[in-house]
Amino acid sequence: MTDYKATLNLPETAFPMKAGLPQREPETLRHWNSIGLYRKLRQIGEGRQKFILHDGPPYANGNIHIGHAVNKILKDMIVRSKTLAGFDAPYVPGWDCHGLPIEHKVETTFGKNQPADLTRERCRAYAAEQVEGQKADFIRLGVLGDWENPYKTMDFANEAGEIRALAKMVEGGFVFKGLKPVNWCFDCGSALAEAEVEYQDKKSDAIDVFFPVGDADKLAAAFGLAQLDKPAGIVIWTTTPWTIPANQALNVHPDFIYALVDCGDRLLLLAEELVEGCLARYGLRGQVLATAKGEALELIRFRHPFYERFSPVYLADYVGLDAGTGIVHSAPAYGEDDFRSCKRYGMSNDEILSPVQSNGVYVESLPFFGGQFIWKANPNIVAKLAEVGCLLKHETISHSYMHCWRHKTPLIYRATAQWFVGMDSKAKDGTTLRERALAAIEQTRFVPAWGQARLHGMIAGRPDWCISRQRNWGVPIPFFLHKESGELHPRTVELMEEVARRVEQKGIEAWFRLDPAELLGAEADQYDKIADTLDVWFDSGTTHWHVMRGSHPMGHDQGPRADLYLEGSDQHRGWFHSSLLTGAAIDGHAPYRGLLTHGFTVDENGRKMSKSLGNVIAPQEITDSMGADILRLWVSATDYSGEMAVSKQILQRSADAYRRIRNTARFLLANLSGFDPAKDLLAAEDMLALDRWAVDRALLLQREVEEAFDSYRFWVVYQKVHNFCVQELGGFYLDIIKDRQYTCAADSVARRSCQSAMYHIGEALVRWIAPILAFTAEEIWQYLPGERNESVMLNTWYQGFAELPDGFALDRAFWEQVMAVKAAVNKELENRRNAKAIGGNLQAEVVLFAEPALAGRLALLGDELRFVLITSAAQVQPLGAAPADAVDTEVAGLRIQVSKSVHTKCARCWHHREDVGLDPAHPEICGRCVENIQGEGEVRQYA
């Protein structure tokens, strides 16, 4: 028996079937490093339109988690796809390096009593160490960026730039000093930004407190009574008993109706709508004596329950009827609404009582409770109220309450003297920061679109921004305040520039070690040098200033604005927010043109990642066991607009999809063995119809892929490319061309035609997957035939396609119909195989009974229809000629009959043909194979 294997064009490639990503990816990283890929991209990008994705800096503390990986991979997919689209898309990674978590870590290690300058030195060293660890992990993910020169907010140039940004805002009239209630953490010993507050359930003491009337005659008159015959008082409800010692007013709504209720031994003032519920809660019976609108109660005084002072009634629109009594007790030092209400009635800062110190302990001079921690004082205050007969009800409730995001401990509002960025104070051009920011939001593209309403609502309702902190490790607020007037030095902006120049040389230590006389000369004795540092959200929120036009100028031809900021959905109140405010203050517009938001990672059951639940998946584990490309493929396949579910099972599905894409690429490479595009590539008009369709289909897909990348819908790219590999290629085209590829003469038009198509598809496919499967695309690139440069990323989208011309008989619609017919035939072939009626498909002969229009189209393929259906014979007959045993199909106007071939199997092509053995020199093979071996070769036109 002759061995015809040597006469076949069998696939051959060194491209490995087994990916071995954990071992092979580090080799690719070394390749990128050795060729200086990032530098080369900047060189070839000169003169191109820029696309700037500005990196929101992760905090330099701890290992990266899966959320960090998602964020960086999304950014990398955008930067890579924009590069392939012909943009110059630099990516400068950054880190947020100042702030309390690092300071807390250093204090935990070295103690709290070390000198401030040593604390800062150790914080800087710790942050630098953390940056290096995170950097290695990000690089391992395949993220392409300027890793040799990232930005760090603690770099001297950035610290100086931040001071200059603050100076711009001072110059614009946005910065002021004020006493206001701010979020305060006792454990931090500092004010917190809104983004540092999280809400958890907390058990609290809920109390109803009686304030005896001080102006009895006025109260009687307000209710139209001649006099009060019994002791009377107003009732408040609160969940913060610790604020009662600081009570200074009582708030009612001007439009609500209030009732004076006779309860036997005394009269209670309550909102009329809540009387029934309150009396039931107190276990009392009562009768309404009279009613009055809230506005009639204005300025009537009531006595504090246990201190010798009065609390007047103020009118306030924020009072509600959803809980309590309809009257709100007001402690202006400990509530934003309380503070605003009391200030509106003329209370000066000096008159505001603030007995709680920064550590949560009452001042020693406070009667009854001095020296007590407020949470521990709560039961003592409740007991005191009961003792003086002013406690009507006490119960414990569970409610959502603000906590520190670091310490997980309850926060309070606390009025302290702080530096603020004013939201509503008029700037020098007559606009407010709030107006500027809201206008900027309207000019910003949001992905997903709902982000616009979310950020708009936050800006519209937010208070002034407290930017000062009482910590060591932070960029200083370099102000000098006059000792008598408390005013800023008249040359503040000029002095800040001098400080910035010094910080540029020696870092923030230049300010902390500065002798004021060096800058102020003889004036130094008249001024205090303040010690406050800036909120870390100001650090990151001004990177558009101190990075994009400072340490790493982006040279954007459309001004100092990023095209895109991309972060998690929590950054609407974080980095997106602070950047918007500083950009609007300094430049009058947002520092970004677009905002992309991604959701948080959860497990397959929708639960948050938690060590206690055991569902945490570290990105390092994935890269070590499966490879970064599997993680990248999962990110691309997931709709990031909502929660992103990840688990080992989900990642395994991504690995399965990866194998299908890799196997498709390997098939293309193996069948391009010996193909030199410089001399073997056929012009489109010389290619077979099926091959022209395959190239045209790839062209259409590329247009869809480009559009999906441009709109950041990576899951669409994944779905379309994966489906193309599995369905159009694996399930149709590549299956059909195997016969022609393997059995036709090596240099025949028939074979070179399908190789030309596979070459075009391979050149395109490697680019489509490059933003997603960064490592695998680079590996494929090295194996593709023809001369090529050092990296797939040094190229743009493939341009070598030829579109099917108009009027082409075997057009797109034709091949769509053929695919449907082939699917119907495959279904019946499978049924016949399962019934043991045939062995393989090539043992089958098929007759297609088709309605005239379909029959006419299928007839265009002539004898080559059998190659498309991958059967040994195929005929087309009229639908009316179909016998009773012909099978109906899902294709309208088509019935099928499959029979087992009676002919001998060709030992070379495996087709069952009547001419096998007719050539005495080749008794085991068919006439077609004889022609392909020793003749001029068969001629194919279509498939």
UniProtKB/Swiss-Prot annotation:
Location in the cell: Cytoplasm
Protein name according to UniProt: Isoleucine--tRNA ligase
GO cellular component terms given for this protein: cytosol
Cofactor comment: Binds 1 zinc ion per subunit.
Residues binding Zn(2+), per UniProt: C906, C909, C926, C929
Main location: cytoplasm
Any one GO molecular function term: zinc ion binding
Motif range ('HIGH' region): 58-68
Protein family: Belongs to the class-I aminoacyl-tRNA synthetase family. IleS type 1 subfamily.
HAMAP family reported for this sequence: Ile_tRNA_synth_type1
Ranges spanned by the short sequence motif 'KMSKS' region, renumbered to the chain: 608-612
Gene: ileS
Catalytic activity of the protein: tRNA(Ile) + L-isoleucine + ATP = L-isoleucyl-tRNA(Ile) + AMP + diphosphate
Organism superkingdom: Bacteria
GO biological process, one term: isoleucyl-tRNA aminoacylation
E.C. code: 6.1.1.5
Protein species of origin: Azotobacter vinelandii (strain DJ / ATCC BAA-1303)
